[in-house]
Amino acid sequence: MCDLCNGEDALPRRQFLRLAAVGAVTVAAGVALDHGTAAAKPKSSGSTTPKVERVAAPAIVTRAQWGADESIRDNHIVGWAPFRKIIVHHTASPNGVKDPAAAVRFGYKLHVIDRKFTDIGYNFLIGPDGEIFEGRRARRYGKGELHTGEDGAGNAIIGGHTKGRNAGTCGIALIGNFMKTPPSNAAIESLIHLIAWEAQRHKIDPMGRDPYIATDSTHLDFFNIAGHRDIGSTLCPGTRMAASLGWLRKQVAERAGRFPERKADMRRLAWVIN
């Protein structure tokens, strides 16, 4: 798993409530193919792209389907918050795996047993063949219900992928090491699809830089679709992935549309403290 994807946030109830009052949020995203370097840092225009079609829900491999051993995880849930940003990771594991589900199981055990997480840190993982895997468990789903990682009100389970920046951020990990090698086209296509779907559902501007307040009350300025290295001391999601973030944002914006910038003092995350 990626270096420094060691970040579950153990926050006291008082701090959770304070963050809810100011509208805390987190970020996620990063990608890489040879599509050019990351673009300059534009502010959200506040406009909406006209005639954008609804992004269809992607197929998601459930925890049961990839073989999660539910007996090893902690049933404690840190909290819930709607996605406001996307953070892209790589697992920094060998490329070209033949059995992506086995790689997900390995990462799950690494996070839970070795790093003492309550569960796998990522919200979603994507294999080299483009399969999208359910990450951290949110709840029991009904028959035929899509495993979104959210409660019934659209609040997402808080992950453990970027320490101090987990609340409100969707952590997506591409399986592999993308320092010198780019992800497969299939993986990139699934990444674009997944982010566009989340962006449209949660009204995240793919080209924007909405204000974000970390769990330690630090005010951060970064893209709504960002790489782990943009907000942490790490090489994740790999040099080749990070170089294509600007291109990725544009691809997502074409599919999902644009949305008005959120102001930090106007956001109110719906926290549920267990």
Model region roles, listed by residue range:
Residues 124:
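Conserved, mostly hydrophobic/aromatic
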